[in-house]
Curated annotation (Swiss-Prot):
GO biological process, one term: lipopolysaccharide transport
Organism of provenance: Cupriavidus metallidurans (strain ATCC 43123 / DSM 2839 / NBRC 102507 / CH34)
GO cellular component: a single term: transporter complex
Record keywords, A-Z: Cell outer membrane, Membrane, Signal
Keyword Signal: yes
Gene: lptD
Name assigned to this protein: LPS-assembly protein LptD
Signal peptide (UniProt feature, chain positions): 1-48
Amino acid sequence: MTEQRRSPHHPATRPPAPPGTSRRVRLPASALRPLVLAMAGLTVSAHAQYGATSAIPNIDLVEPVVTQTPEAPPPPAEGGDLVPRLTEPATRTAPSGNTLNLSPSSTPSNPNAPAYVSGDRVTGYSEKGVEMEGHAELRRDGGVIKGDRLTYDQDTDEAHATGNVRLSKSGTLAVGPEARMRVQANEGYMLSPDYYFQQTGGSGSAERVDFLDPDRSTLKKATYTTCSPDNADWYFSARKLDLDSDRQVGTAYGGVLNFFGVPIAGAPAFSFPLNGERRSGVLPPLFGYGSNSGADLTVPYYFNLAPNRDLTIYPRILTSRGVQLGEDFRYVGDGYSGRIRGEFLPDDKKAGRNRWAYSIQHYQSIIPGMTAYVNVSKVSDDKYPDDLTRSVSQSTLRQYTQEGGVIYAWQDWVFMARVQKFQTLLPSEPSYEREPQLNAKYNRYDFHGFDISLETDYTRFRIPLTSTGFQQPEGNRAFIQPTISYPIIHPGWYVTPKFIFNAAQYNMDAGTNTTGASNTLNRAIPTVSLDSGMTFERDAPGVSKLFGVKYTQTLEPRLFYVYTPFYDQSQFPLFDTVQSDFGYGQIFTENPFTGNDRIADNNKLTLGLTTRLIESETGVERFRGTIAQRVDFTGQRVQLNGTLPDAKPSYSDLLAATTIQLFRGYYLDAGIQWNPDQDKVNYSNVALAYRPESRKLINFGYRYRRPTSVTDNTAIDQIEMSGQWPITQRTYGIGRVAFDKSANQLVDALAGFEYAADCWVGRFVYQRFRNTSNGYTGRVFFQVEFRGLSKIGSNPLDMLRLNVPGYEPVTARPVPTTPYDHYE
């Protein structure tokens, strides 16, 4: 038996009036904007955009960036923009948002437009009056009035229609038993109208609508929904609506959002914009559950301070911890922009102390090409990310940046001066801070065939004591590194010789450098390299015959040689240098270290070979296979920590990788790092995906890394599975699990489902992940998305996109319509 749900369209089944004791929750402005169409002849100018104000922004404290200047702060992680992004002009006042963005029709009315009438029987009752019966119809200036009986007086421009009356204009249709209108003046009324908006799919009903003038109208006991008339799962109702298109504002009295007949949100009175402009008010609530904080409810309030400034306040109730207050202030102007965010939780019930976090970003244009910036973030204690942040990425942050600087770009030069400090949370050890760093870079490409670059840098490095009270080396470092190369590129082959010269000087603080080492250290090391490659192509008839598509196969050998003389750097500090991960990218570089404190000695030749299968007609790559190995003719003596005295000629691990997309819906990426001397696999990874169509996917991944040295002693043996798959026609399951075999423990997992009705989507997700305190954190996400209205609940979409590769959110499935539906 098919379930019959309440419809807001038929008078006999019109939703009841709002309960007298409605919850004081403000609905987004977009809830009522479609109603304007039926009253004031407005037209839809944009489609609905979901989720812009459905959730609060996180603090999003910025991770440290040691090699470049941070970019502008990102938009809120769990919602859309409340104001224009900071890189946009300050004159933009209508942000993308969760609105239908309705605006008056761009076509002005024509007071001299002729009127056309028709009917089964047409009778003139005066010189300019006419009466029609049976399929009566009046058309004027793009508007249509129909009814069983219709009278029209051309002198007064007044039309009176009774019996199955239909008013239509600009894609809006209203149906009722009676209407009286002064057509051109847009004054009159309609009784018991049911209305439909073609471009948005929204519809509703009212007891009466009064058109006061071209700009103002009033509805009594009005409803609105984007559901189909026979299954109105949700609808918005209001005791009274006052709409003023001249002021672009509407006021709702007794507004209630009903879901399956149950009032879930309401407000005694509130105003809303009619044209997408921002207005101050309460935003949809965000709620969820976390194992560290209990039930979590946030009700944001938005202040529209100015066209280029806004402030959002986030009162947050955590049942296990107390009441937290957050704020997010944004501003953008001519040559400057910024964002200030903060959170404060007084007297945390669990921790027994005040908890807080803040983040400040500011960007200021000084002169053309010169920008100053500040990027500062800090938290109150080491446990703050685990206890009070809202995402896995934030909960695992162990370092927060306090940085300020100036960048100047002039022709081929970029100059930078900055001070960079960090707040490092236990159990992580502190990082080196730059107090200050002065850097200049020059890049010139194709200067008479040469590519030229130059980098020079002076940095004062300081570091806090370690957790055990140990003082690491501190001092000043200055280096200069010119580079010149001459690429020779021809069809089918290329050769690129390159010369690099690195000169550096260290002035160490007394008593902090390696025991017995000088406080002044110098080095000057040249490097030469030669990179070369060729590309051969041929038809692949065997593969083409097998798959029924013409393929081209390539064969691409590559040789890379690098030579750097040995220079003992065992007494040099490690300020910003680490060992690069060995892989296909690193094996074709001049230095296996990242940073400027170690320059490896090289006498190495890398040999690589790649083959591809490419669809000849489309150019799509369906297969790639790569193999590479490096030959070290003398052995590398310079190590990250010290010098290897007995280095010998050797072969590197053999690298092999493949990417396969030959079969529709199947994707494979695999790689392996094999040590031929020990006959052992040092690293391997496999990623297999099956995606036959949209919102159908299964991912499998495996990663393995064997500890190979004292500095690389972290073992990885991890399996990951994730997917999204339809369970029924409207229900989709989502899941992920990651298990660490080496530690025999769960890394993270999530499970949930999405349900897509014709006018709403429901999402429920539970996530559990290992935190930095060697424990687990669990979170519950529950969200309902009302098509064309708003979202209520906690937003899991960003988390799902991050954890389930290829995930696509399900969307509501409205009943299909055609341009001729409701055509008049």
